[in-house]
Amino acid sequence: MAESDGKEKIKWTTTIIISSSLKSYEVAAALENRSHKVRYSDSVENGSIIFSLSGVAFLLMDARECFMSAEETFLAKIEKFINIHQNSFLVLFAALHGPEEWKLMFRIQQRFLGSNLRILPVHNTVNAINLMCTIAKITSKSYIDSICYRMITTKAYIIEQSPVWKTLQKIKLSSDTFNPN
């Protein structure tokens, strides 16, 4: 635990289900190194990472592999994935997101327009891990509760302390005295 601005930061860890096809990949090792409980499964879609407590799932695909395979093959894989997972993200790896990669993303977006799929273009493993962990963290129940509490506290502070709010209340009170209704 590290201290910052007088507050303790608690290290966030969760259980992650990873496709067995990713066992030898850098992504799996990086998630294990972050002290997450990693479980491998043959029953999930190849290339998928599921943060079960957060309810989010990520499908990892390399842009080069998409270019080399038939379009219907990888589109069918994506469709199967989004039909299974309600909160789904496609993590599209490319060292450089040039015109071809952007066209690929556009085709995928067109195909799945109106679905629950979101596309995350990433350049490397560190980028992918940071995005996945951030999304999973902010969608976990404990963080949602914490964010809601902070928003309620901030709202209460603004109402109690804001000179603008006080002025608006005075205006409202003075306008009520003139209103015959």
Swiss-Prot record:
Thylakoid keyword on record: no
Assigned keywords, A-Z: Chromosome, Meiosis
Record-linked InterPro entries: SCRE (IPR027857)
An individual GO BP term: reciprocal meiotic recombination
Localization per record: Chromosome
Summary of subunit composition and partner proteins: Homooligomer. Interacts with SHOC1, SYCP1 and SYCE3.
Reported function: Plays a key role in reinforcing the integrity of the central element of the synaptonemal complex (SC) thereby stabilizing SC, ensuring progression of meiotic prophase I in male and female germ cells. Promotes homologous recombination and crossing-over in meiotic prophase I via its association with SHOC1. Required for the localization of TEX11 and MSH4 to recombination intermediates.
PANTHER family per UniProt: HYPOTHETICAL PROTEIN LOC689986 (PTHR31408), PROTEIN SPO16 HOMOLOG (PTHR31408:SF2)
UniProt protein name: Protein SPO16 homolog
The organism of origin for this protein: Bos taurus (Bovine)
Gene name, Swiss-Prot/TrEMBL: SPO16
